[in-house]
């Protein structure tokens, strides 16, 4: 029978438990309310099935010059230009890929009416890098969002 010294077993046991947090990933760590880098809006990220989505829950300027709630006036689809910006689902179909990354999603920019491929990375508990791009990720722009409310 093989005899393994007690000290080796103890060290192996401690290493296994010390490494456990490195492998345990919180797929839902992204859930909550996030403020855009410009500070002009907040998006609530939520989960539907196994994918992640986001909707506008706050706008710095919620109303147009006439005092009416702002709408999606820059949307290329004319029939959607009257929908309110507040409540608009502007993030969709993100998949958790490990290493604090959610990818293969889409982001809609109501300022331009454009829809982009998008990846997101949680760099710390309260900082989210949101990268919108056309085609490949190197042809894009990254915005840094800050957590406002964590999902309870």
What are these regions (language model features)?
Residues 25-31:
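Cleaved targeting-peptide boundary
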Residues 98, 124-126:
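Residue-level recognition of beta-strand termini and adjacent short loop/turns
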Residues 48, 123-124:
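Structural motif
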């Amino acid at each position: 029978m093989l005899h393994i010294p007690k000290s080796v077993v103890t060290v192996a046991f401690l290493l296994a438990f010390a490494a456990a947090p490195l492998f345990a990933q919180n797929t839902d760590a992204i859930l909550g309310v996030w403020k855009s880098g410009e500070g002009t809006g907040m998006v609530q990220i939520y989960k539907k099935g196994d994918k992640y989505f986001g909707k506008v829950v706050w706008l710095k300027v919620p109303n147009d010059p006439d005092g009416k709630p702002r709408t999606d006036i820059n949307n290329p689809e004319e029939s959607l230009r009257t929908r309110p910006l507040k409540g608009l689902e502007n993030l969709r179909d993100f998949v958790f890929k490990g290493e604090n990354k959610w990818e293969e999603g889409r982001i809609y920019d109501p300022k331009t009416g454009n829809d982009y491929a998008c990846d997101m990375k949680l760099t710390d508990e309260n900082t989210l890098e949101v990268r919108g791009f056309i085609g490949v990720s190197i042809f894009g722009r990254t915005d840094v969002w800050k957590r406002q409310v964590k999902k309870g």
